[in-house]
Amino acid sequence: MSQVKRTPLYETHRALGAKMIPFGGWDMPVQYSGIIAEHNATREAAGLFDVSHMGEIFITGEPKIVLDFLELVTCNSVASLSDFQVQYNAILNENGGLVDDVTIYKFSVEKYMICSNASNYETVTAHLLKYLPASGVKVSDQSPNWHQIALQGPKANEIFSKFLGRELDSIKYYHFALLDYQGEEIIVSRTGYTGEDGFEIYSSIPFGLKLWSGLSELGKPQGLLPCGLGARDTLRIEAKYPLYGHELNNQWTPIESGIGWIVKEKKNPYFSSGKILSQKKNGTEFKIVAFALTEAGVPRENFRVLDFQGNEIGKTTSGTFSPSLKKGIGLASIRTEKIKDGEPIQIEIREQPKQAIITTKPFIPGSIRKN
């Protein structure tokens, strides 16, 4: 059995009284003061998350060869990216399933960075190396050299701007900047996984520790709290964001996973592009949708979804009690013909059918500043 890894902030989490759990091969904080308090702090003020377990994989080389390589293994259009733009994308396997969902950072025509999930970045690196051209492209997993934290919430911009001593409004949603702070170059990305405005900040490990401490102290009067994986999960479900291993896996295509909006037609074919584009046009048997309970109950993963005749039409993939809505919500893979906004369904919780409705609208408005 491989040894559980610890982030550079492990001792800080212990000192803060965090409850630690294994996640994706890492020992991570699930909560500090409490999931609901941390969730609400992020929605109303700011939350600080240790995400240094994520992977950073750099792709460099000759511009055309690099671009062609990235276009082959992904479904979104990397060619559409401008310098210093970020893109949500998926690394595909040969059958159109997801090796991982990722964000791709374009520094220049010669340099890109892929941010991958903690449990997958070694798999992603191996997959990329498997299909690497004979020359012209280099793939480098630099995850051990980077520290990443996320500052999220409606007050994130105010807090981080004050910390840096400069405005950050020029960094638009899903864009990033290379900033110099006291001689340290950091990557500041206006992205996140909460449905709120905020930043994901990449730096050296020593600076990352200072950044966590400085932001914690500066943000505390504003209501900032350190947040664990528990709040990260409730926040992302409210935002209808998928999680690998739940809504996403190596069998389901992007269409079946509910992220069909990132599937694009490209100049050249990519892995299973014929199959995936056909699904986008003609539909699939199952698809990920969101639902909300209309009576008391807390849904979890792998609960049966029923129609009102009692027929099984799918399974839940994620579920939680929503601190913002104060009711049970979740995501599920269900038969496509049953997907309609407001359609009544049932979620079987402890062998008891609980009434729910499908919702295609956002659960929460959030504070994201779209460009």
Curated annotation (Swiss-Prot):
InterPro entries xref list: GCS_T, GCS_T_bac, GCST_C, GCV_T_N, GcvT/YgfZ/DmdA, GcvT/YgfZ_C, TrmE/GcvT_dom1
UniProt xrefs under Pfam families: GCV_T, GCV_T_C
Annotated GO CC locations: cytosol; glycine cleavage complex
Superkingdom: Bacteria
Alphabetical GO biological process terms: glycine decarboxylation via glycine cleavage system
Gene3D superfamilies assigned: Aminomethyltransferase beta-barrel domains, Aminomethyltransferase fragment, Probable tRNA modification gtpase trme, domain 1
ATP-binding recorded as keyword: no
EC code: 2.1.2.10
GO molecular function: aminomethyltransferase activity; transaminase activity
Enzyme class: transferase
Catalytic activity: N(6)-[(R)-S(8)-aminomethyldihydrolipoyl]-L-lysyl-[protein] + (6S)-5,6,7,8-tetrahydrofolate = N(6)-[(R)-dihydrolipoyl]-L-lysyl-[protein] + (6R)-5,10-methylene-5,6,7,8-tetrahydrofolate + NH4(+)
Keywords: Aminotransferase, Transferase
SUPFAM superfamilies: Aminomethyltransferase beta-barrel domain (SSF101790), Folate-binding domain (SSF103025)
Role of this protein: The glycine cleavage system catalyzes the degradation of glycine.
Family in the record: Belongs to the GcvT family.
Oligomeric form and interacting partners: The glycine cleavage system is composed of four proteins: P, T, L and H.
Protein name from the UniProt record: Aminomethyltransferase
Record organism: Leptospira borgpetersenii serovar Hardjo-bovis (strain JB197)
Gene of this entry: gcvT
